[in-house]
Amino acid sequence: MTKVGLRIDVDTFRGTREGVPRLLEILSKHNIQASIFFSVGPDNMGRHLWRLVKPQFLWKMLRSNAASLYGWDILLAGTAWPGKEIGHANADIIREAAKHHEVGLHAWDHHAWQARSGNWDRQTMIDDIARGLRTLEEIIGQPVTCSAAAGWRADQKVIEAKEAFHLRYNSDCRGAMPFRPLLESGNPGTAQIPVTLPTWDEVIGRDVKAEDFNGWLLNRILRDKGTPVYTIHAEVEGCAYQHNFVDLLKRAAQEGVTFCPLSELLSETLPLGQVVRGNIAGREGWLGCQQIAGSR
């Protein structure tokens, strides 16, 4: 039996309004629990369009057929008009998710975090995280115990900033296994549960065809030597590719693969490490990557 952490990122208004209810129904039918990370502030995701001038981002948008994958409402959100606030407008959906799944903060403003947080000072970062946590806690009526940085934009500054919130764990980086990042003080920080497997948009049209993706991914899962964690997006697997996701769950069950919330992957003893800036094939720009203590 292979146990895989299932992380669901919710980046946009439509992903919350349309994708999350569909995913909740699918997961219920398959008796699966997951960790769902919500963006709760303004939906300004369309402002990423300026990145089309970067060849790597343009190629990603073309090979993943982004207009069909996400829809023009997502691709243009927050460009010619202020982005709609996601959280309170979809409070009932978020509360329903929290009844059955582990719920955490993805971001207050996903676009702002992904585009600008790398240049924020620590206090600006703390204020932004606090705003998102406060909003999500108002919606679900209980403390939020986990978070996942938007776009995996995380480094030592993010690790230090999140210590102020005493969360149970964060999932801010890519890597191989859960670990505790070392703080500037030399003490171990809040546990990190890295994503180990590629997302749909990172590999489609580059490493694998859409129709072959599920078999390709299951092969990666079964060969994973660490602690496998897979991320889906409400805007993708909850919308245009929900049938592919259902097929993945069916095939996974046949292969003895089970999915669980990320918190079930934690153990009492974890290795030490760091979150450093790095690059992942298929994704434009830097992102947080696990580095085991003592390695280079």
Curated annotation (Swiss-Prot):
- Induction of synthesis: Induced by BasR.
Q: Which reaction does it catalyse?
A: 4-deoxy-4-formamido-alpha-L-arabinopyranosyl di-trans,octa-cis-undecaprenyl phosphate + H2O = 4-amino-4-deoxy-alpha-L-arabinopyranosyl di-trans,octa-cis-undecaprenyl phosphate + formate
Which residue numbers delimit the NodB homology domain?
A: 2-260
Alphabetically, which GO biological process terms does the record hold? 4-amino-4-deoxy-alpha-L-arabinopyranosyl undecaprenyl phosphate biosynthetic process; lipid A biosynthetic process; lipopolysaccharide biosynthetic process; response to antibiotic; response to iron(III) ion
- NCBIfam families per the record? PRK15394.1
Mind telling me which InterPro entries this protein's record contains? ArnD, Glyco_hydro/deAcase_b/a-brl, NODB_dom, Polysacc_deacetylase_ArnD
> Could you identify this protein by its name?
Probable 4-deoxy-4-formamido-L-arabinose-phosphoundecaprenol deformylase ArnD
A GO-annotated cellular component: membrane
Record key words, sorted: Antibiotic resistance, Hydrolase, Lipid A biosynthesis, Lipid biosynthesis, Lipid metabolism, Lipopolysaccharide biosynthesis
Keyword NAD listed = no
- Tell me what organism the protein belongs to: Escherichia coli (strain K12)
A GO molecular-function term, please? hydrolase activity, acting on carbon-nitrogen (but not peptide) bonds, in linear amides
Instruction: Name the CDD domains for this protein.
Output: CE4_ArnD (cd10939)
HAMAP family, A to Z: ArnD
